[in-house]
Amino acid sequence: MSQALTLARPYGRAAFAIAREGGNFAPWSDALAFSAQVAGDPRVAALLLNPALGQEQAVTLLAPPQAGEDYLRFLGVLADAQRLSLLPEVAGLYEHLRAEAEHVVKATVTSAAAMSQTELDTIAAALKKRFGRDVDITTAVDASLIGGAVIDTGDVVIDGSLKGKLARLQSSLAH
């Protein structure tokens, strides 16, 4: 596990605990996604390392306009600990904890071409049956897959792509 994830874990858990206590999962998701995107920009990352940038300025830079007091205090804690650069990891950990709490599996379905809603509904039903949880599907298109799809739930990857099948066939023929 990367050092960044290790360092971000307590902050992700803290953000989740605060959001759960207030019943504000969605606003915290939105705020963390905003802050993570801003902090992930290389120019902003360099600015955050500048000692001339004050803590209040950093919090103002990274906070979304609709941020509540709890979220601003949370960013202040990160700024005090010089951990604002970990916001992308904190956001990812928060989303994982939220999905667990809401009994939702987040899946990314990458296909060679755009999929119809019927196909996505079939995949969602199969994943719900397999995991026993509701499924939140995000789609992506990657023409290099040639055909089929790759389903990634974080812990489980199902490669039903033609590219993957050809790679497995090549590997078995080589041995």
From Swiss-Prot:
PANTHER family: ATP SYNTHASE DELTA CHAIN. It is found in: Cell inner membrane. Gene3D superfamilies: N-terminal domain of the delta subunit of the F1F0-ATP synthase. Keywords: ATP synthesis, Cell inner membrane, Cell membrane, CF(1), Hydrogen ion transport, Ion transport, Membrane, Transport. F-type ATPases have 2 components, F(1) - the catalytic core - and F(0) - the membrane proton channel. F(1) has five subunits: alpha(3), beta(3), gamma(1), delta(1), epsilon(1). F(0) has three main subunits: a(1), b(2) and c(10-14). The alpha and beta chains form an alternating ring which encloses part of the gamma chain. F(1) is attached to F(0) by a central stalk formed by the gamma and epsilon chains, while a peripheral stalk is formed by the delta and b chains. The lineage of its organism: Bacteria, Pseudomonadati, Pseudomonadota, Gammaproteobacteria, Lysobacterales. One of its GO terms (molecular function) is proton-transporting ATP synthase activity, rotational mechanism. SUPFAM superfamilies: N-terminal domain of the delta subunit of the F1F0-ATP synthase (SSF47928). GO terms for cellular component: plasma membrane; proton-transporting ATP synthase complex. This is ATP synthase subunit delta. It is a peripheral membrane protein. F(1)F(0) ATP synthase produces ATP from ADP in the presence of a proton or sodium gradient. F-type ATPases consist of two structural domains, F(1) containing the extramembraneous catalytic core and F(0) containing the membrane proton channel, linked together by a central stalk and a peripheral stalk. During catalysis, ATP synthesis in the catalytic domain of F(1) is coupled via a rotary mechanism of the central stalk subunits to proton translocation. It comes from Xanthomonas axonopodis pv. citri (strain 306). InterPro entries: ATP_synth_OSCP/delta_N_sf, ATPase_OSCP/dsu. Belongs to the ATPase delta chain family.
